[in-house]
Every structure is written in structure tokens, then in C-alpha cells.
């Protein structure tokens, strides 16, 4: 028995001596200067109409996290001779700009109303940054909700429970709260908080009560 245990113990000691891979470095939030205060106040309910704006940060910008106020819109990013057009799909939009390798970017929003703009260096992004994926064609669970708060009020336990178990969950809303900007942001913030990563499907029916 000792002859069997000794080689196993020796192997375990060797493994314990191996270097452990370092954890991902957290992405530093970069300070943006020269912008309207409404774009950096962290308040989704304030907004500024943005045409071409210049972003200047205190470090190389790897990603931009853009919070549209109520409607998504295509925008263009430029730096030097390089230009990229971004087709917005999400109200809370994360965009990779690491290819520009610059601390200064010119972004043309074409008059879109923007609530907030965040800039990050390379690394693991903070939890509040929402990296949405496109809605699923096939899901393990499909949750239909009449209003944006019904999913949290009546299914608040279901969503985090199955999301934590790796289930692909798609949420569908029958009403679009275009007349209530706050609820559109609360909808996304609530889903992200409970572990949903696929962007919700939202119909065009208005909400009346």
C-alpha cells in the first residue's frame, strides 16, 4: 500500500509547486475629458445630442461602453487614418476599439441622444458593463413577459437559478416602453444583474395603463 501511495504523494507535491496562472487584470476605467457632463454623470436619464465628439483619455482605450438614451443608432469611430463604422444593436452597447491603439478617438454619433460613455483599458471589464449577445434562435428556456417588470416581479427566482446552471434563456417582452425611458434601462439592468446574457426580444406594442 505504501509503495502505491508514495508515487501519488510525490506527484501531488510536484503539482503544488507549479506556478499558478495569474488572474485576468481588471480593466482600468479611463477618465474622459472635454465632454458634456451629462455623458459622464452615470445617470441613464440624462442625455446629450451628439454629433462628432472627440474622446481623450488618460490611457490607451481598449473598449467603449455606450449607453444610448432611447434609440440605438449607427456611429463611426476614427483615429488617424483608420475609420470604423459600428452598427448598433443594443441600447447598452460595448464596442471593442483596441485595434485603434490610441488614447484619442473621434466618434460621430450623427445626432443620436447618448446618456453615458465609458472608456476602459485592456483587461477584465467591471461587472456593471453589459456585454450583450444577439437573441437566441433556439433556447433552453423562453420567458414571455407582458411588461418590463413582470419578469422580475413574478420570475425573479427562476432567471438567476437557471442562468447560474448554464441554461440558455431568452426573454421576450410584449410591450415596448418607448414612452418611459427609465423602464427601458431598468429592463436591461435587471436582466444583466440576474445573469441573462442574450439581448431581449421587444415587440413594438406601446404600453398603456
Feature map (PLM): residue ranges:
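Positively charged n-region of N-terminal signal peptides that target proteins for export
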Residues: 1-4
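Bacterial N-terminal signal peptides
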Residues: 8-16
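Disordered, acidic Ser/Thr/Pro-rich linker "stalks" and the adjacent N-terminal cap
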Residues: 17-61, 69-70, 74-75, 79-81, ...
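Active-site rim/loop-helix segments in enzyme catalytic domains that contact anionic ligands
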Residues: 31-41, 47-48, 92-94, 99-209
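Binuclear metal-dependent hydrolase catalytic cores
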Residues: 68-72, 89-94
